[in-house]
A protein has these predicted regions:
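Conserved protein kinase catalytic/activation segment
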Residues: 134-146
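Structural motif at the C-terminus of the N-lobe alphaC helix and the adjacent alphaC-beta4 loop
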Residues: 56-70
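Conserved hydrophobic alpha-helix
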Residues: 65, 113-120
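C-lobe/activation-segment region of protein kinase-like
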Residues: 143, 147-241
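Conserved structural core of kinase catalytic domains
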Residues: 38, 54, 72-110
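Catalytic-loop of the protein kinase fold
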Residues: 122-132
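ATP-binding glycine-rich loop module of kinase domains
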Residues: 12-13, 18-56
């Protein structure tokens, strides 16, 4: 239970930073994140028509997952129009793209992230978009962020496949992460996850491999999104044949 001084301080921040979706702050030596619904303008009103609903869904999801002991940030304080999260360290993306960290440490971090996602699925829970920028690592502790993009599908096999594809796609998006590194991560994940989940993902990629070949002529001019798709198919499917 947070004290009255903390609550009052947060309310002042909400008033002062009401147009900021995410605002970091320090209180008594600890770092927190204040999160509010997005304030959208222009085309984004069409692309994301229900920011308040998405915000409430994320808060509800965080609270429910915390009850199930899932690795999510602690919600320190919340109301209908904001919530405060305790800081949970750097993202996996930040760790892996840090040139001052050796590869052995990077493998340790990404392997921890793999096991955390596998464990989440073993509990019949899904994230919805477990990109490495939405996963943090701090001294061996893995935490999942940003549950706003969770799928409404009731097909458990599909939502697990979706999680796995988002995870590997996010690795493929990073220029600083080599194909060899991702191949080792894929082998580690395959070794430790349920065989059925890995096979389901491979079957999905095989079924949609035509997309890879359809997009292949554009490879010389491809940008980040397309490059990630090429790498995803090549690392997990094409080059393993």
């Amino acid at each position: 239970m947070v004290n009255d001084d903390f609550q009052e301080y947060v309310k002042q921040l909400v008033t002062k930073h009401r147009d900021e979706r995410i605002y970091p702050f320090q209180y008594e030596g600890k770092k927190y994140w204040l999160k509010q619904p997005e304030k959208l303008k222009g085309i984004w009103l069409l692309l994301k028509p229900h920011p308040k609903k998405s915000f409430k869904n994320e808060l509800y999801t965080l609270l429910k997952l915390a009850e199930q002991n899932a690795p999510v940030p602690k919600v320190s304080y919340y109301s209908d129009h904001f919530f405060v999260l305790e800081n949970v360290g750097l993202t996996v993306s930040q760790w892996l793209c840090n040139k001052n960290i050796d590869e052995q440490q990077k493998f340790l971090i990404i392997y921890d992230a793999c096991l955390a996602l596998i464990d989440l699925h073993a509990k019949n829970l899904v994230h919805g978009r477990p990109a490495i920028r939405d996963i943090t690592w701090d001294k061996g502790k893995v935490t999942f962020l940003d549950f706003e993009s969770r799928s409404n599908s009731q097909n458990q096999n599909w939502v697990v496949i979706r999680d796995m594809l988002f995870f590997f796609d996010s690795l493929c998006r990073e220029e600083d992460i080599s194909d060899t590194f991702i191949q080792k991560v894929a082998l580690y994940y395959q070794t430790h996850c349920k065989a059925k989940n890995w096979q389901n993902m491979i079957v999905f990629l095989q079924r949609f491999s035509w997309v890879y070949y359809l997009l292949l002529p554009f490879k010389p001019i491809a940008k980040t999104d397309l490059i990630a798709i090429y790498r995803l198919f090549e690392i997990l499917l094409i080059n393993k044949k």
